[in-house]
């Protein structure tokens, strides 16, 4: 039996960065995709592509792999448990089961690879890009190339992209651009936004909410969230995601300044160590976080962020 989440519940749970629906989190069988908002992340992206509906998944061996990829997207700790080190699921960053333009949709990502990535300074295949998601956003370990987990996710992404020309600049890819704010992002202002619009879902300390051990609303920081190496560890990336996708079901309801401020506040909290640890916070920041949009290795409220020792072995 699947528990339902009412529209009122969604309306109340404002600004849950990574807000996953209770329906997908608590499904007993195959997970269900959270509903799309009437005003969603696709607005303003210029995207004209519509991925095929789930009803069009073929009823054959390939279709079974596509469905497994979809299930991994919606409940990653359940369907890819060997490679996950936290309680997040892929759908928390890629809404509508990876279909939504402006929410880093899988169909746009699939046609954008292979591509050079500054993050690891080499050309990455699509499977290698997926490996990074498990290593950083899932705070786990990379599934081997050719593994069933990666083949399933790649199959699902390929199926979503059918009919879309290969183009690394396809409209709707990633998150919509958000210009830097007139005022520098601020911790105190961000805390006020969080307390007004996030706390009901994600709790006072960003720990999220759970029912019977299942994630209903995922953690935004702390030991069960993404690690310092994840893309959301850049408060610029986080601000873009928040502005276009949150509050869940209420996209673009925050001002750009509010999105920047609350992203800064979220990324000013402690989380698991960057797995690329270089032996010290200073060395790790110098090699991987030398950006004004990363708070890793900086002091916030007297605390040196990232000063938690070496990462735990996976």
From Swiss-Prot:
* Keyword Manganese tagged: no
Q: Which residues bind heme c 2?
A: 198, 201-202
Q: What does this protein do?
A: Catalyzes the oxidation of 2 molecules of thiosulfate to tetrathionate, using TsdB as an electron acceptor.
Location relative to the cell: Periplasm
Descriptive protein name: Thiosulfate dehydrogenase
Keywords tagged on the record = Heme, Iron, Metal-binding, Oxidoreductase, Periplasm, Repeat, Signal
PTM: Binds 2 heme c groups covalently per subunit.
The residues listed in the UniProt record as binding heme c 1, with positions renumbered to this chain, are 90, 93-94
Query: What range(s) does the Cytochrome c domain occupy?
Result: 58-192, 185-270
Its primary localisation, in coarse terms, equals periplasm
Q: Which organism is it from?
A: Thiomonas intermedia (strain K12)
PROSITE patterns the record matches: CYTC
EC number(s) in its UniProt entry? 1.8.2.2
- State one Pfam family annotation: Cytochrom_C
What's the name of its gene? Answer: tsdA
Indicate whether Cytoplasm appears among the record's keywords: no
Q: Which reaction does it catalyse?
A: 2 thiosulfate + 2 Fe(III)-[cytochrome c] = tetrathionate + 2 Fe(II)-[cytochrome c] + 2 H(+)
């Amino acid at each position: 039996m699947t528990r339902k989440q009412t529209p009122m519940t969604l309306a109340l749970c404002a600004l849950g960065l990574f807000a996953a629906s209770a329906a997908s989190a608590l499904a007993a069988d195959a997970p269900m995709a959270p509903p799309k908002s009437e005003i969603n992340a696709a607005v303003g992206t210029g995207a004209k592509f519509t991925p095929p509906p789930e009803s069009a998944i073929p009823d054959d061996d390939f279709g079974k792999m596509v469905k497994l990829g979809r299930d991994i997207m919606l409940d990653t700790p359940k369907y890819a448990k060997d490679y996950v080190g936290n309680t997040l699921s892929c759908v928390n960053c890629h809404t509508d089961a990876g279909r939504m333009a402006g929410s880093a949709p899988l169909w746009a990502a699939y046609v954008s690879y292979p591509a050079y990535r500054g993050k690891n300074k080499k050309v990455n295949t699509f499977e290698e890009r997926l490996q990074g998601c498990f290593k950083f956003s899932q705070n786990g370990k990379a599934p081997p190339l050719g593994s069933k987990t990666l083949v399933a996710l790649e199959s699902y992404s390929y199926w979503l992209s059918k009919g879309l020309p290969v183009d690394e600049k396809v409209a709707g890819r990633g998150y919509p651009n958000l210009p830097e704010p007139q005022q520098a992002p601020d911790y105190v202002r961000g805390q006020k936004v969080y307390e007004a619009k996030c706390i009901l879902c994600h709790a006072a300390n960003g720990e999220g909410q759970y029912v019977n051990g299942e994630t209903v609303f995922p953690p935004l920081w702390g030991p069960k969230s993404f690690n310092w190496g994840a893309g959301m560890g850049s408060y610029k990336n986080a601000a873009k995601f928040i502005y276009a996708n949150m509050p869940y079901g209420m996209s673009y309801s925050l001002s750009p300044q509010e999105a920047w401020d609350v992203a800064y506040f979220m990324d000013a909290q402690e989380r698991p160590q960057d797995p690329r640890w270089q032996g010290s916070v200073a060395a790790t920041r110098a090699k991987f976080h030398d950006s004004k949009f990363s708070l890793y290795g900086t002091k916030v409220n007297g605390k040196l962020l990232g000063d938690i020792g070496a990462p735990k072995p996976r």
